[in-house]
């Protein structure tokens, strides 16, 4: 069997730690024959373990410690430490591996509870499990999630050629906001979510770019962000935002305007790459060989 988990783009502006969307890049785990010891074959990076030290197996064995070892093949086009949920995809894959080999019959909500407990927040793991747009919360162990279709629009990801670790990106955030700032930030997030659910991308885009929770503190960590935002705004994008903790920059635009936006960005002296993406509507799934 093969376990497939989509990449995710979290926060979407003001939906900090609570809003995310699944997109069309994938982690794939092919489950092969039984062995005496676990073996993960991959070419993702020399520093990524091939045995039980791999995060995939740490998660699976944490849930079902006595799983029969197997040979696994891991492939992924989800870039590491780029703000597209690479670690979350592995967490969800590990849960699904335990679910399948341990015959647990977990519901999606049970998978979400496990994943959120491990990850600490649901914004990436929720869309990786459900697909589509997910608005979720985790408060004192209580996890809630609402799944919805993302409005019709094109996604364009600018993926830099450098990493930005989440812990480094979080280190620039303030320890607290004033009550007045929190109310303003919350109201913007409310409008962003409501507009997305209503299919109003113009209003959603304005609210996404109006975030007060994190982007203003993080934007200087991604040197291309300001120029990309300027170019995309001049060419009619709905919104441009930092995907997750960055450094990937996500552009949302109508289908007719995205080709011009992409062409203009290709003229810029950036060293990263542009990727056309779509919304993944399935989330984690298992295919028979």
Curated annotation (Swiss-Prot):
ATP binds at residues 79-89. It is an enzyme of class 2 (transferase). It catalyses: L-homoserine + ATP = O-phospho-L-homoserine + ADP + H(+). Keywords: Amino-acid biosynthesis, ATP-binding, Cytoplasm, Kinase, Nucleotide-binding, Threonine biosynthesis, Transferase. It comes from the Bacteria. InterPro entries: GHMP_kinase_C_dom (IPR013750), GHMP_kinase_C_sf (IPR036554), GHMP_kinase_N_dom (IPR006204), GHMP_knse_ATP-bd_CS (IPR006203), Homoserine_kinase (IPR000870), Ribosomal_Su5_D2-typ_SF (IPR020568), Ribsml_uS5_D2-typ_fold_subgr (IPR014721). Its EC number is 2.7.1.39. Belongs to the GHMP kinase family. Homoserine kinase subfamily. PANTHER family: HOMOSERINE KINASE, HOMOSERINE/4-DIPHOSPHOCYTIDYL-2-C-METHYL-D-ERYTHRITOL KINASE. This is Homoserine kinase. It comes from Streptococcus pneumoniae serotype 4 (strain ATCC BAA-334 / TIGR4). The gene is thrB.
């Amino acid at each position: 069997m093969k376990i497939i988990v989509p990449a995710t783009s979290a926060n979407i502006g003001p939906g900090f730690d609570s809003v995310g969307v699944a997109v069309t890049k994938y982690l794939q785990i092919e489950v092969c024959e039984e062995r005496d010891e676990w073996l993960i074959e991959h070419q993702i990076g020399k520093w990524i373990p091939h045995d039980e030290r791999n995060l995939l197996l740490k998660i699976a064995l944490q849930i079902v410690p006595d799983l029969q070892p197997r040979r696994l093949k891991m492939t992924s086009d989800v870039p590491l430490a780029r703000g597209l949920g690479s670690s979350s995809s592995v967490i969800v894959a590990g849960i699904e591996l335990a679910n399948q080999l341990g015959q647990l019959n977990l519901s999606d909500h049970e998978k979400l509870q496990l994943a959120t407990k491990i990850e600490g927040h649901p914004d990436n793991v929720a869309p990786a499990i459900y697909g589509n747009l997910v608005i979720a919360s985790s408060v004192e162990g209580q996890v809630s999630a609402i799944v919805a279709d993302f409005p019709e629009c094109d996604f364009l990801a600018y993926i830099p050629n450098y990493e930005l670790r989440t812990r480094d990106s979080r280190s620039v955030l303030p320890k607290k906001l004033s009550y007045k700032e929190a109310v303003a930030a919350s109201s913007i997030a409310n409008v962003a979510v409501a507009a997305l659910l209503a299919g109003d991308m113009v209003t959603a885009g304005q609210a996404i770019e109006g975030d007060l929770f994190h982007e203003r503190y993080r934007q200087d960590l991604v040197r291309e962000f300001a120029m990309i935002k300027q170019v995309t705004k001049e060419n009619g994008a709905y919104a441009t935002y930092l995907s997750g903790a960055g450094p990937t920059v996500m552009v949302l635009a109508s289908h007719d305007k995205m080709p011009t936006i992409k062409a203009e960005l290709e003229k810029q002296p950036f060293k990263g790459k542009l990727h056309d993406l779509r919304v993944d509507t399935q989330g984690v799934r298992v295919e028979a060989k």
